[in-house]
């Protein structure tokens, strides 16, 4: 997408009223090999037809899927205002980049597929953004696009703030003072 289209898209979405959040009902393909979903999507992953190699489980519940070759990586995160996600961003974004590079389909999920998984997906996409696009604009574009498709995305204000601080404010400070 060119800059003009991106700016227009973000401005139109940002100036309209956001619809009330609703629980997403189906898994979403975020990139060629990275998917966003919920707990039910994870349990149904072996029969999804996608051929998942990995599941990144961000719930506090550790589980296995019987008769499946999918590797489940458990990063137990709590969906509240006190959880510090920033210490997980680098590991998760590197892992997802490696899956993308090796063409390994991976499902990122939490219980509802909204906050914890939404934050990790947003961090991953922000880590891969083009240097030509301002970080704040890209953040808004992703946020509105995914929220529009899924009905709810990254609703936890603390998680949004942590992503904004790491990928927008800190990046801006580096450009100004680095």
UniProtKB/Swiss-Prot annotation:
GO MF terms, alphabetically ordered: protein serine/threonine phosphatase activity; protein tyrosine phosphatase activity
Q: Indicate the principal place this protein occupies in or around the cell.
A: virion
What chemistry does it catalyse, as a reaction equation? Answer: O-phospho-L-tyrosyl-[protein] + H2O = L-tyrosyl-[protein] + phosphate; O-phospho-L-seryl-[protein] + H2O = L-seryl-[protein] + phosphate
Which Gene3D superfamilies does the entry mention?
A: Protein tyrosine phosphatase superfamily
Report the enzyme's class at the first EC level: hydrolase
Q: Where in the cell is it found?
A: Virion; Host cytoplasm
Instruction: Identify the catalytic residues.
Output: 110 (phosphocysteine intermediate)
Subunit annotation = Homodimer.
Per its record, how is this protein called by name?
Probable dual specificity protein phosphatase H1 homolog
């Amino acid at each position: 997408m060119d800059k003009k289209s991106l700016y227009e898209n973000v401005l139109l979405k940002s100036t309209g009223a956001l619809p009330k959040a609703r629980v997403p009902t189906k898994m979403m393909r975020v990139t060629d090999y990275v998917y966003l979903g919920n707990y039910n999507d994870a349990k149904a992953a072996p029969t999804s037809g996608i051929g998942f190699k990995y599941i990144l489980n961000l719930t506090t519940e550790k589980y296995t899927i019987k008769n499946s070759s999918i590797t489940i990586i458990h990063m137990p995160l709590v969906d509240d205002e006190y959880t510090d996600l920033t210490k997980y961003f680098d590991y998760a974004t590197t892992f997802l980049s490696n899956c993308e590079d090796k063409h390994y389909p991976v499902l990122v999920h939490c219980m509802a597929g909204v906050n914890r998984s939404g934050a990790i997906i947003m961090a991953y996409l922000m880590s891969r953004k083009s240097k030509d696009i301002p970080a704040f604009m890209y953040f808004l574009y992703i946020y509105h696009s995914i929220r529009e498709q899924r009905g709810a995305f990254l609703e936890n204000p603390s998680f949004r703030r942590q992503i904004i601080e790491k990928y927008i404010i800190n990046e801006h400070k580096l450009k100004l003072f680095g």
